[in-house]
Design a protein with these regions (language model features):
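Conserved functional hotspots at enzyme active or ligand-binding sites that engage polyanionic ligands
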Residues: 1-117
Length: 117
């Protein structure tokens, strides 16, 4: 891969083969790893994206105009995975800095770095 993924980009990921309740098939994911790691490592860290809308504090809603996706979706920061960059098929979109800040807050909640109030 010549162009490495960058934090805040949405990529189509080939999740196969999946195990248990992991994502399956080809689905979008948000790159959440820092860009130094994205440039140097053979892996990246992503958060799964789904059109199955469930409003939990760890989920971030994204509209099509914000994401490059066709449907209203959620970023599931409770499903953070390290994947090989070989699984990345194509870039679909880029989040705004404001939306990335929402994701940062949701990650803190998901990892227990901040309390739910």
């Amino acid at each position: 891969m010549n162009n490495f993924p960058r934090r805040g980009e949405i990529w189509l990921v080939n999740w196969n083969p999946a195990r248990g309740s992991e994502q399956r098939g080809k689905r979008p994911a948000l790159i959440i790893q820092n860009d130094i790691g994205n440039e140097k490592a053979p892996t990246t860290i992503v958060a799964a994206i789904s059109t199955s809308i469930k409003f939990y504090p760890m989920n971030v809603k994204i509209e099509p105009h914000e994401s490059g996706l066709h449907d209203i979706s959620i970023i599931k920061t409770s499903q953070i995975l390290t994947i090989s960059k070989i699984r990345l098929e194509k870039k679909l979109g880029q989040l705004s800095e404001e939306k990335i800040e929402e994701v940062n807050q949701a990650i803190k909640l998901s990892l227990g770095l901040e309390n739910l109030n």
